[in-house]
């Protein structure tokens, strides 16, 4: 199954056309940390992460991971765990994925810059939730109902094609 991001506000999967939003500064073939752009390319999908205190276990064929209070994603290009899931500590700092808002109640890792990770080339690129469709820091976001549809359709061989 292929998720296709056709433009800044349209995602297609199977016979579904869904509303989405992308990075504030659009798309790029040359992503770097903090540019607020969504990376162009075709990428594998990683695990689906979810807050079991807020949402049900997702119905999907992807690997599922529960988000705990101390979970984070390393966005420090100088850290050996750059662009990896981490347990937050004084030593390992990063983006908190156990958030007060709803954005990461469900999210899917997009395997951008994940194999042979290159520092400063961008981190924490996810397909996550939104309520207002405001542009993101580089991720792709959909509403809750769309995420449920997407999760049900995906399998371990699924990919996402951005532009």
Predicted features along the sequence, with ranges:
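Cell wall/extracellular polymer interaction/catalysis modules
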Residues: 1-137, 145-163
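A conserved hydrophobic position in a structured secondary element of the catalytic/binding core
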Residues: 142
